[in-house]
């Protein structure tokens, strides 16, 4: 049975005002359906204006919308399909498939606005999550069921790192992933979809996209669509990986919507509700006694300024941060993870073990010392250093290069097969470099290899 019917009275871009009878106003966050002949437009109620008008934000383009059109209150929030049927498929913010592979016959449909799990349902048993990427596993390990921020400016490799993580998790752990593209390039989304089909990880992944060209309403809500699909798997006892690329675009879309709704902007022009909106999303990403959601969120840093309110608000929710640095890109080292800026709450001897903690600390110390010596080297040259400092510089440069790694998803561009390196192998490799076992090998032998044994082989081929 159709719900209450109203009339469109004003359309300003993606903002649509609809008049209902004053005794039958739709609730906030209800989905409103407007039949436009060739298609149905869905809008979400954001404000009640006066006694009988609701202000809504359209989830699709409003071209062709006219005043006087009928608008039907669906009497529920935007709801999306969940369950095994969503795996291997590509969706938009409304949970409609956009991969031309037919309808999705899901057993259940969940609303995208849901409460966060209660405290008594949440589980906090810190446990390390192996990614197979050396620099991450050693220096800023991820927590199972934690939130990880991937920070970096434009073009430093955030999306490639996310693709490699999806690949490693599916192949090594057999885990399910939900990838949410929030306000990013459609071309990248298309490439990701086809690459995942070719590599065979698509069957373990659901993809949800609200890309750059879509209205702000879609970009603001698409993260919730992906999260809702992930929550279902978690509640059924699965360990799920939720990728959000890019969480900054979620904030950006919220800022656009806030301005369109006439709210007075806050610091740097962001919405006054920035912390609340971010909290509502992040509090739902958590582990329960049934299963876990581990989320990896790419965070675009405007003008590389980490004090900007958008990345700064995101920081407060994270368990680990992986910072990608342009200065490391300039050295030709990929993944361009900054070993000194990246951090993790679980890099603790009680959680990762004494050996792991000690090796990670020594690696950071030697890189710090190398950083201090670089000024002296720039002015006086390496020859003026003491023998002890020369050994530090030599080992630090090897460590720096050993932090690089060839990725499976980059194979077609680099021609190098990707490498998955276990935590045990990673710790062993760095420990031996620090002990001076490979002092006689050239530093180029450590660039783009997996385990440390490969450096010996590479050195022979370079000789």
Curated annotation (Swiss-Prot):
Molecular functions per Gene Ontology: ATP binding; ATP hydrolysis activity; proton-transporting ATP synthase activity, rotational mechanism
Pfam families: ATP-synt_ab, ATP-synt_ab_N, ATP-synt_VA_C
Top enzyme category: translocase
Record carries keyword Transferase: no
Binding site for ATP: 152-159
Xref: InterPro entries: AAA+_ATPase, ATP-synt_VA_C, ATP_synth_F1_bsu, ATPase_a/bsu_AS, ATPase_alpha/beta_chains, ATPase_F1/V1/A1_a/bsu_N, ATPase_F1/V1/A1_a/bsu_N_sf, ATPase_F1/V1/A1_a/bsu_nucl-bd
Keyword terms of this UniProt record: ATP synthesis, ATP-binding, Cell membrane, CF(1), Hydrogen ion transport, Ion transport, Membrane, Nucleotide-binding, Translocase, Transport
E.C. code: 7.1.2.2
Signal peptide from the UniProt entry: none
One Gene Ontology cellular component annotation held by this UniProt entry: proton-transporting ATP synthase complex
SUPFAM superfamilies in UniProt: C-terminal domain of alpha and beta subunits of F1 ATP synthase, N-terminal domain of alpha and beta subunits of F1 ATP synthase, P-loop containing nucleoside triphosphate hydrolases
Protein's cellular compartments: Cell membrane
Predominant subcellular localization, coarse grouping: membrane
Reaction equations catalysed: ATP + H2O + 4 H(+)(in) = ADP + phosphate + 5 H(+)(out)
Subunit-structure text: F-type ATPases have 2 components, CF(1) - the catalytic core - and CF(0) - the membrane proton channel. CF(1) has five subunits: alpha(3), beta(3), gamma(1), delta(1), epsilon(1). CF(0) has three main subunits: a(1), b(2) and c(9-12). The alpha and beta chains form an alternating ring which encloses part of the gamma chain. CF(1) is attached to CF(0) by a central stalk formed by the gamma and epsilon chains, while a peripheral stalk is formed by the delta and b chains.
NCBIfam families reported for this sequence: atpD
Family assignment from sequence similarity: Belongs to the ATPase alpha/beta chains family.
Protein name per UniProt: ATP synthase subunit beta
Organism: Clostridium botulinum (strain Alaska E43 / Type E3)
Gene: atpD
């Amino acid at each position: 049975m159709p719900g209450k019917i109203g009339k469109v009275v004003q359309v300003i871009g993606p903002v649509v005002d609809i008049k209902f009878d004053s005794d039958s106003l739709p609730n906030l966050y209800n989905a409103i359906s407007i039949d436009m002949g060739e298609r149905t437009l869905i809008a979400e109620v954001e404000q009640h204006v006066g006694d009988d008008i609701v202000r809504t934000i359209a989830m699709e383009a409003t071209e062709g919308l006219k005043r006087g059109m009928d608008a039907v209150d669906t009497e529920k929030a935007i709801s999306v399909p969940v369950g095994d049927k969503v795996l291997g498929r590509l969706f938009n913010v409304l949970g409609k498939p956009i991969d031309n592979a037919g309808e999705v016959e899901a057993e259940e449909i969940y609303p995208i606005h849901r409460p966060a799990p209660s405290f008594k349902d949440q589980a906090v048993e810190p446990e390390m999550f192996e990614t197979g990427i050396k620099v991450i596993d050693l220096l800023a390990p991820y927590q199972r069921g934690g939130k990880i921020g991937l920070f970096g400016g434009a073009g430093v490799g955030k999306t490639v790192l996310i693709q490699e993580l999806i690949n490693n998790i599916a192949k090594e752990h057999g885990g399910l992933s939900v990838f949410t593209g929030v306000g990013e390039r459609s071309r990248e989304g298309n490439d990701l979809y086809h690459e995942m089909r070719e590599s065979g990880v698509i069957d373990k992944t659901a993809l949800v996209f609200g890309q750059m060209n879509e209205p702000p309403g879609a970009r603001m809500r698409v993260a919730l669509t992906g999260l809702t699909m992930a929550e279902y798997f978690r509640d059924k006892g699965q360990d799920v990986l939720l990728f959000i690329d890019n969480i900054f675009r979620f904030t950006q879309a919220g800022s656009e919507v806030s301005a369109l709704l006439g709210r007075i902007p806050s610091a740097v022009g962001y919405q006054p509700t920035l912390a609340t909106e971010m909290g509502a999303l992040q509090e739902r990403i958590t582990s329960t006694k049934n299963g876990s959601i581990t989320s990896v969120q790419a965070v675009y840093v405007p003008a590389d300024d980490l004090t900007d309110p958008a990345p700064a608000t995101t920081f407060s929710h994270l368990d680990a941060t992986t910072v990608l640095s342009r200065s490391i890109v300039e050295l030709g080292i990929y993944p361009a993870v900054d070993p000194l800026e990246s951090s993790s709450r679980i890099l603790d001897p009680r959680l990762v073990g004494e050996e792991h903690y000690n090796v990670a600390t020594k690696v950071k110390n030697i890189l710090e010392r190398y950083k201090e010596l670089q000024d002296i080297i720039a002015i006086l040259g390496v020859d003026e250093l003491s023998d002890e400092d020369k050994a530090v510089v030599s080992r630090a440069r090897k460590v720096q290069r050993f932090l690089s790694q060839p990725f499976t998803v980059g194979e077609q561009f680099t021609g190098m097969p990707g490498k998955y390196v276990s935590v045990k192998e990673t710790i062993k490799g760095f420990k031996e470099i620090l002990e001076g076992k490979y002092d006689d090998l050239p530093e180029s032998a450590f660039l783009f290899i997996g385990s440390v044994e490969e450096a010996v082989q590479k050195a022979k081929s370079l000789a």
